[in-house]
């Protein structure tokens, strides 16, 4: 899912 910069940071944190 793509949401924006915040989503990118969240995904990186999850990874």
Curated annotation (Swiss-Prot):
**The keyword rRNA processing appears for this protein:** no
Tissues of expression: Expressed by the venom gland.
**GO CC, any one term:** extracellular region
Keywords (alphabetical) are: Disulfide bond, Glycoprotein, Hemostasis impairing toxin, Hydrolase, Protease, Secreted, Serine protease, Toxin
Q: Does the keyword Secreted apply?
A: yes
One BP annotation, GO = proteolysis
Q: What is its main location?
A: secreted
Q: Where in the cell is it found?
A: Secreted
Q: How is it modified after translation?
A: Glycosylated.
Q: Name one GO molecular function term.
A: toxin activity
EC number(s) on file: 3.4.21.-
Query: Please, which domain of life does this record's source organism belong to?
Result: Eukaryota
What is the documented function of this protein?
Answer: Snake venom serine protease that may act in the hemostasis system of the prey.
Family as reported in the entry's similarity comment: Belongs to the peptidase S1 family. Snake venom subfamily.
Q: What is this protein called?
A: Snake venom serine protease
Q: Which organism is it from?
A: Bothrops cotiara (Cotiara)
Lineage, top ranks = Eukaryota, Metazoa, Chordata, Craniata, Vertebrata
């Amino acid at each position: 899912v793509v949401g924006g910069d915040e989503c990118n940071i969240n995904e990186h944190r999850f990874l």
